[in-house]
Amino acid sequence: YTVSNRVALGLRVEVDGKNGYAGTQTAQDAEELVARAIDNARTVEQTDENPMQTAQEYESVEFPACPLCGLSIQEKIELAKSMEQKAKAADARVFQTPHCVVSTGRMARRLKNTRGLDASVREESGAIALQAAVREDEEIHDGFAVRTGAAALDVDGCVTEAVQKAVACFGAASVRSGKMPVLFDREAASDLLGAFSGMFCADMAQKGLSPLTGKEGQM
């Protein structure tokens, strides 16, 4: 079980109509932070076109509560253990769970300045994730599933999905080359698009590194 905390402080100052920026993850460096922000503003050659906000009215937004965030540390550990146990009980061919994770997080953010702006937001999030590895004779496959938000306590659904994805790969084989109708799983479609995403990059096309260069507007 691991816990990590991160605090970040960003400062924006206005000096002679120019904005300077600086950031730190150590609150003790306040004086240095101010000095760096002022120094940054003095290096700017043009007047900033984004004036600082004054006091504003913001609509109150209620974020849904995370069901995992209310659990104790021990309860989260037990939840992870139960996922592994249920995965192995779901199918005798499950021999390992390389990833079995229960994760929660809380975030607080605040914007405040000397002109009256004071806005803040707090959020919490949680997720469970499982990778189930299955083996039959010489074949080994794995399946992955995740649940987030209000569904983060759906352990049974997460386990079933991960195991079914893994088991479904048994007996799979390459098909002959040819032209034929294809049904894409949504994750497979995403992976395929990702493999070719560089082709659609304007920078790659302008450099002549994309096979789509010069084919704009074609179908």
PLM features per residue range, with description:
Residues Y1-S103, A150-K179, F184, T213-G214:
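Alpha/propeptide regions of enzymes that mature by internal proteolysis
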